[in-house]
Amino acid sequence: MGKTLARSALVLLLFLPAAAAAPALLVTVGEVTDTAAVLWVRGHSPGPIGVQYGVSGGPRRERAEIQVSLAGDFTGKLPLVALAPASRYRYTVSQGGSEVQGEFVTAPPPAAAAPVRLVWSGDLGSRAQCRHVTEGYPIFRALARYRVDFFLFVGDTIYADHACGGSDRVPGYDFVARTLPEYRAKHRYNREDAAVQAYFRSLSVYAIWDDHEVRNDFSGPSEKLTEVGRQAFLDYFPIRPPHDDPARLYRKFRWGSLLEVFILDTRQYRSPNTEPDGPAKTMLGTAQKRWLIDSVAGSTATWKVVVSSVPLSVPTGGKAHDSWSNANVLGFPEENATGFALERDAILRGFRERGVENLVFLAADVHHAELIRHHPTPEWSFHEFIAGPLSASLGRPRPLDMGLNPRSLFALGGVETFGEVSVEPAGLTVRIVDVSGAVRFTHTIGPEAGR
């Protein structure tokens, strides 16, 4: 116990900002709806942080304060309520002599058929791919060139279990996190990148964790570091779980009548990866699985987008499967495998039986980009779009799980990527964009006849 406390104190001292050189305030807005949002801040000292916000160009500015303390790593959140739908808001956050400004847009009313644009990706700061001393995280400058409504940060927002250092890397990431101060330091390191800061101040961010926020391929109930990893994640993103379920991360939000997004937590409730697949094995847990099927089936939005940090059809994992797939490296489904395909297929069957149309899954994790059309039965199909990494080891496309009858429309490895989705009444267009900002592939799908 004494060694653990001493180590925690040392890490805290190493990563606390120096009093003589207070860093810029960190700000992110998330959980935006048509009438509300959550503003997250990190200050550089304990005490109040001032917030002013209002409709861009409007005559009125609301004022509020967020109290932060050392115990919370100087982080805090402020609910923004009674906002105007389909409006651009600007805000100013200040503490001491520091001040930063940002903006975001609110969603249109639920019945409005308003166009929407989003981007998604994941996997930031793996071994040998943390912040470059001169370039930082360059993909965020490419992201900033695309004017969108929000960013979906689809897991591996940090690599807590990777040490990254060297003369060409910004110091502060060369350790494996095991304590709450260390996990927070990992998040702070990524968020302090200048390009990340600027980008996160330009729009709203919806984030979800995957495995590296805690440890590679972890399963929540059986991992002793789940609680501290989850706490640090919640400390550093503008997420406000329900009061009666303070650990809950899965959620949904609607963007007009054309789009509803369902964000899954694929870690907190999962059975150990090493267990053979079977009726009792779960990635989502009973409550989240039922919520997902009922919410997607009950949605009246034209397009239903499900965010899964791990892919449906790409086999992953070392000694055991970590994604939904039970397929081997050649794409053939295997009996007695250790994936989660039975639960995946039960969810898809629930969607099909309840007439779900215009269904898209967004994923990351595998460090390559791919656009896939699945046709598991003759009368029903859906799409899976994968993007990434933001800055991590580069992967290559691999055989897909043939149990879903997939058709790869495009695949790209060996380069950092993100995906852009544009939804209009006429259809949905997806683009894969590389780190230079170049569009590598574009594909459009039209809405099916139903809702």
Predicted regions and their residues:
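Metal-dependent phosphoester/phosphodiester hydrolase catalytic core
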Residues: 22-451
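Bacterial N-terminal signal peptides
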Residues: 7-18
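Positively charged n-region of N-terminal signal peptides that target proteins for export
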Residues: 1-7
